[in-house]
């Protein structure tokens, strides 16, 4: 076990008193024993699976709680932060008063006082000059395991004199009984204070709150320094060619960037500075619903000792039923990045990106499997951040639900979306990068585009054959589509071919175009936004 001479006395500075014992930066073996301790109850308890990984449940919180997210409004954030408009659903950055913050902080520090605590010191960001040194404090072993997997693990030398830039206090066992009087959403809370540099978590057990909390902080700090902060995966080819994959949850970021032919930089959060693209994280957080060894062998084989499964169904014999979504469709696994064989080592960073891929899972069946974007279309589709989900309705009818999430990650943005677009475009122009829109969703047949076809499309983008292909223009959206690509069924490249008649596509496409136009109106309050309208669909 690594020791940093951290004492209970040191924790008094955070308001945490009478700590019984500190388990500092525990080893994986220690965490394994702690999680499987038969004396644990409820959501603290881990279960051993036949794959060697421990599985835990996070209760009713099987995903993030965006409605319970708050940021303290003070002199630091008042004029810089992208605040939510009450009830307009623009984003989740709801302001919190200093008074309520102090109350929430008191609840969490009281919860952690007098306990045996796990403390993990780690880095967020692979570049030493811009990384955050983060200290995580929790009373739950598997939460310490989660952050050890997901953040960058310091060397023993780096732990000597480790000074945290940010403190995360996870009080999952405490709730806020005064939430109504304080005008909050519920008794649960995920609160950030960018002046005190502290994140507080109460009520929710979902591990991803710690991960995305620090992502929100990086999304605040980096663009103000001219560094792109991106919700994307990234990988690098044998010739050093870097590709980044933007996309919302479930569009294929992790799956498509985990490619045996290319080395993985990271699967979810990256920066892009003067040296190139770098990972914020030290692990991957992959969806496991319907995971199969055949379709996603790298991810399947990463699920072994030291990986941590969340909300999966474990049978009595210890086998995992990856097809069972009864607890949630958002079943997950976190694992240290070195569980993937083909990674960039020793530091998760590479040169400048030349291919920028926007992933969308279009459940309307309108968008083509791939199109090549102009510079203005790149900004338009980045700000739109479109995907669509299939949601079950009463009589078994599935109606697609459109989602527009600025920069393919509105939930984690702390500055105005146009600031991220400007920084990304500058980085792309300097590197001569080209953007593409790839639909990993459905077509007119009602079937999802196969991983095999999507991988062949990605290969064509990365090896340059798509750039050399002849293209035609798709009406309404004015997207440039290749007429043929190696290894891809030519019939599916034009989405109109997958409908009984072109009129059927036209009808659905018109409806989707209207949604795009309506959504983009929120960006037309600036001349830069107004200038991009012509890059979108035209009715």
Curated annotation (Swiss-Prot):
Residues noted as binding substrate in the record, renumbered to the chain: 64, 206, 212, 332
Q: In which pathway does it act?
A: Carbohydrate biosynthesis; gluconeogenesis
Q: Which residues form a coiled coil?
A: none
One GO cellular-component annotation of the UniProt record comes to: cytosol
Concerning CDD domains, the annotation shows: PEPCK_ATP (cd00484)
**One record GO biological process:** gluconeogenesis
* Entry keyword set: ATP-binding, Cytoplasm, Decarboxylase, Gluconeogenesis, Lyase, Manganese, Metal-binding, Nucleotide-binding
The chemistry this enzyme catalyses reads: oxaloacetate + ATP = phosphoenolpyruvate + ADP + CO2
Entry EC no(s): 4.1.1.49
Residue positions annotated to bind Mn(2+) are: 212, 231, 268
Residues noted as binding ATP in the record, renumbered to the chain: 212, 231, 247-255, 296, 332, 448-449, 454
The cofactor required is:
Mn(2+)
Any one GO molecular-function label of the UniProt entry: phosphoenolpyruvate carboxykinase (ATP) activity
Q: How is the cofactor bound?
A: Binds 1 Mn(2+) ion per subunit.
Concerning its family, UniProt says: Belongs to the phosphoenolpyruvate carboxykinase (ATP) family.
- What's the subunit arrangement here? Monomer.
Q: What does this protein do?
A: Involved in the gluconeogenesis. Catalyzes the conversion of oxaloacetate (OAA) to phosphoenolpyruvate (PEP) through direct phosphoryl transfer between the nucleoside triphosphate and OAA.
Q: Which HAMAP family match?
A: PEPCK_ATP (MF_00453)
Name it. Phosphoenolpyruvate carboxykinase (ATP)
Q: In which organism is this protein found?
A: Salmonella gallinarum (strain 287/91 / NCTC 13346)
Q: Which gene encodes it?
A: pckA
């Amino acid at each position: 076990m690594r020791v940093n001479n951290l004492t209970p006395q040191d924790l008094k500075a955070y308001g945490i008193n009478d700590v019984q014992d500190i388990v500092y930066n525990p080893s994986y073996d220690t965490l394994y024993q702690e999680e499987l301790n038969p004396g644990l109850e409820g959501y603290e308890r881990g279960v051993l699976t036949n794959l060697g990984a421990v599985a835990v449940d996070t209760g009713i919180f099987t995903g993030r709680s965006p409605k319970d997210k708050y940021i303290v409004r003070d002199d630091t954030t008042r004029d810089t932060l992208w605040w939510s408009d009450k009830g307009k659903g623009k984003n989740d950055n709801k302001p919190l008063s200093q008074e309520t913050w102090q109350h929430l902080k008191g609840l969490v520090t009281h919860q952690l006082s007098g306990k045996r605590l796990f403390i993990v010191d780690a880095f967020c960001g692979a570049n030493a000059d811009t990384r955050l040194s983060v200290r995580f404090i929790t009373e739950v072993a598997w939460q310490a395991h989660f952050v050890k997997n997901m953040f960058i693990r310091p060397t023993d030398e780096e732990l000597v004199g480790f000074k945290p830039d940010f403190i995360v206090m996870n009080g999952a066992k405490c709730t806020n009984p005064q939430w109504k009087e304080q005008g909050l959403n519920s008794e649960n809370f995920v609160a950030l204070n960018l002046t005190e540099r502290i994140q507080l978590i109460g009520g929710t057990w979902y591990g991803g709150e710690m991960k995305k909390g620090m992502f929100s902080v990086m999304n605040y700090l980096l663009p103000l320094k001219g560094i792109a902060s991106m919700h994307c995966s990234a990988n690098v080819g044998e010739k050093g060619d870097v590709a980044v994959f933007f996309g919302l949850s479930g569009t294929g970021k992790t799956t498509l960037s985990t490619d045996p032919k290319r080395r993985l930089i990271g699967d979810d959060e990256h920066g892009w500075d003067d040296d190139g693209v770098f990972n914020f994280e030290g692990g991957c957080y992959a969806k496991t619903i319907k995971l199969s060894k055949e379709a996603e062998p790298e991810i399947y084989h990463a699920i072994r000792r030291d990986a941590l499964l969340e909300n999966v169904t474990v049978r009595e014999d210890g086998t995992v039923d990856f097809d069972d979504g009864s607890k949630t469709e958002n079943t997950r696994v976190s694992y240290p990045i070195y569980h993937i064989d083909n990674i960039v080592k020793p530091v998760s960073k590479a040169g400048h990106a030349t291919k920028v891929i926007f992933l969308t899972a279009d459940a309307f069946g309108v968008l083509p499997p791939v199109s090549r974007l102009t510079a203005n279309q790149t900004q338009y589709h980045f700000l739109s951040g479109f995907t669509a989900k299939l949601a079950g309705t009463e009589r078994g009818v599935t109606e697609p639900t459109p989602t527009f999430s600025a920069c393919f990650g509105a939930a984690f943005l702390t500055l105005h979306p146009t600031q991220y677009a400007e920084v990304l475009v500058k980085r792309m122009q300097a590197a001569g990068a080209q953007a593409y829109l790839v639909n990993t969703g459905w077509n007119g047949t009602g079937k999802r585009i196969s991983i095999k076809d999507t991988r062949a499309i990605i290969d064509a983008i990365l090896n340059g054959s798509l750039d050399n292909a002849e293209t035609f223009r798709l009406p309404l959206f004015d997207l440039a589509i290749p007429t043929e690509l190696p290894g891809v069924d030519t019939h599916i490249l034009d989405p109109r071919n997958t409908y009984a008649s072109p009129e059927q596509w036209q009808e659905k496409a018109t409806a989707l175009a209207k949604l795009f136009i309506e959504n983009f109106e929120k960006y037309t309050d600036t001349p830069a936004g107004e200038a991009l309208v012509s890059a979108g669909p035209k009715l």
